Amino acid sequence: KTNGITFRRWLLSCNRELASFLSDTIGDGFKKDADKLEKLLEFADDQAVLDRLAEIKSEKKKELAAYVKEAEGVVLNTDSIFDIQVKRLHEYKRQQMNALYIIHKYLEIKGGKKPSTPLTFIFGAKAAPAYVIAQDIIHLLLVLQEIINHDPEVSPYMTLLMVENYNV
């Protein structure tokens, strides 16, 4: 639980397909007791369950990509790994650490170490006007977005999107 938001709220409100599948697979107990999600371990080798989970994940990534295309005009590779951090920007919320990781991955790609699966980093953030460090981190992310997305050697393997109309 963080800032009063629980996984149940996001799961039950934002991913009804997954919530429904979980209910069908392990029962409704997880809605009140997160420990009940451990029942999923019983299906770790069940290919039908794994296939359906992958299908739901793929559908949701496509929905997000369609939204981003409409709202931001950016086409996302839904076969990439999505790493998303959308929240008010603050030093303790690790956006800066994530930016440093992105720089590390960028330098690895430039050095010839290409990831086996492309990476997509999505940020949505705002900060108080007087919070200079947070404003600087947003600026860093915007500069990284420009560099990464326009580097023909890197952009096939990594994309960075700083959502313009952050509204959480």
Language model segments and positions:
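Catalytic cores of carbohydrate-active enzymes across secretory and cytosolic contexts
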Residues: 2-168
